[in-house]
Amino acid sequence: MYQIVIETEDGETCRRMRPSEDWISRAEAERNLLASCRAGCATCKADCTDGDYELIDVKVQAVPPDEEEDGKVLLCRTFPRSDLHLLVPYTYDRISFEAIQTNWLAEILACDRVSSNVVRLVLQRSRPMAARISLNFVPGQFVDIEIPGTHTRRSYSMASVAEDGQLEFIIRLLPDGAFSKFLQTEAKVGMRVDLRGPAGSFFLHDHGGRSRVFVAGGTGLSPVLSMIRQLGKASDPSPATLLFGVTNREELFYVDELKTLAQSMPTLGVRIAVVNDDGGNGVDKGTVIDLLRAELEIDLLLGHARRRRRRETARSCREDHRDRCPAWRSDFLEKFLASG
């Protein structure tokens, strides 16, 4: 038996485990850590700071080679070969010590095209007796939605907040996507769909009142919008900036919604960029990285081939700008894979 120490952002918890068990499976009987598919989606990513382990069946998209070298692991794919010390990116109160219901039935309330390649889907959780009830989640989390009559599921982040009582999703349409086809040809108001979740560890962290900078491209706006809406409902006084971008102007969406949100939140600034555009009408020409560079007055290296150097450069920039730009004192990122 090995001693496994899971350290949260504000404490730690221990559990002994047999070598044949991954951490997520062993923990299920007593506690629920943040996880989703149990098969390598990267929701349960953590840092191993000490000990020997074996990572089994991990996709390179979930843990790239450079991250694996740095000690990144997926708890659902990590099998200990010695005592381990693991760091998770959330606080102790995110761990549940009782069973959590993760399967739900929901009804489609709206399914509307909001740009050339984006659909707004609104769901309402329901019970068999048609009583509508809310589904509790943390802004930034996601659920899996199943196409009726199939076993095909896709993961999408909520753009709404739990207090609204509805689940709003901003979904990109892909040419050969199964869920994209469902949205365009089959989805109807009143139709019921199965949900699984919520899941995910990408959410707002305590930042001590410092300013926040949110960066979102395309439908990556969805979880960010949920977070900002939550800040608005809480009347959070901290300065916040949203940098949002798309490739072409016809792909723009929620411009009016963002403008209204900024008007209702005096501490929120919104900037929008379009790559293939001359700018104007409240839109800048360029990428969200261009907006971020202007916001922080630093240079970033781009390109997949330079990922390691980019990360090292960004880390150096954070060190150089900690005093001048509080937003760089901590950063949180969630990678999104195309999901049609």
UniProtKB/Swiss-Prot annotation:
What are the binding positions for [2Fe-2S] cluster in this chain?
A: C37, C41, C44, C76
Where do the 2Fe-2S ferredoxin-type domain residues begin and end?
1-92
Sites binding FAD sit at 215-229
Q: Which domain of life is it from?
A: Bacteria
Task: Fetch the InterPro entries from UniProt.
Answer: 2Fe-2S_ferredoxin-like_sf, 2Fe-2S_ferredoxin-type, Beta-grasp_dom_sf, Cbr1-like_FAD-bd_dom, FAD-bd_FR_type, Flavoprot_Pyr_Nucl_cyt_Rdtase, FNR_nucleotide-bd, MRET
Q: Which GO terms describe its molecular function?
A: 2 iron, 2 sulfur cluster binding; metal ion binding; methane monooxygenase [NAD(P)H] activity
Q: Which Pfam families does the entry mention?
A: FAD_binding_6, Fer2, NAD_binding_1
Q: Which co-factor is required? A: [2Fe-2S] cluster
Top enzyme class, one word, equals: oxidoreductase
**EC number assigned by the record:** 1.14.13.25
A Gene Ontology biological process noted in the UniProt record is: one-carbon metabolic process
Q: Which reaction does it catalyse?
A: methane + NADH + O2 + H(+) = methanol + NAD(+) + H2O; methane + NADPH + O2 + H(+) = methanol + NADP(+) + H2O
Key word Metal-binding present in the record?
yes
List, for all copies, the residue spans of the domain called FAD-binding FR-type.
Answer: 101-205
The record's remark on the cofactor is: Binds 1 [2Fe-2S] cluster.
Instruction: Cite the entry's keywords alphabetically.
Output: 2Fe-2S, Electron transport, FAD, Flavoprotein, Iron, Iron-sulfur, Metal-binding, Monooxygenase, NADP, One-carbon metabolism, Oxidoreductase, Transport
Keyword Flavoprotein on entry: yes
Query: What is the purpose of this protein?
Result: Responsible for the initial oxygenation of methane to methanol in methanotrophs. It also catalyzes the monohydroxylation of a variety of unactivated alkenes, alicyclic, aromatic and heterocyclic compounds. The component C is the iron-sulfur flavoprotein of sMMO.
Subunit (UniProt): The soluble methane monooxygenase (sMMO) consists of four components A/MMOH (composed of alpha/MmoX, beta/MmoY and gamma/MmoZ), B/MMOB (MmoB), C/MMOR (MmoC) and D/MMOD (MmoD).
The name this protein carries in UniProt is Methane monooxygenase component C
Q: Which organism is it from?
A: Methylosinus trichosporium
Instruction: Output the lineage of the source organism.
Output: Bacteria, Pseudomonadati, Pseudomonadota, Alphaproteobacteria, Hyphomicrobiales
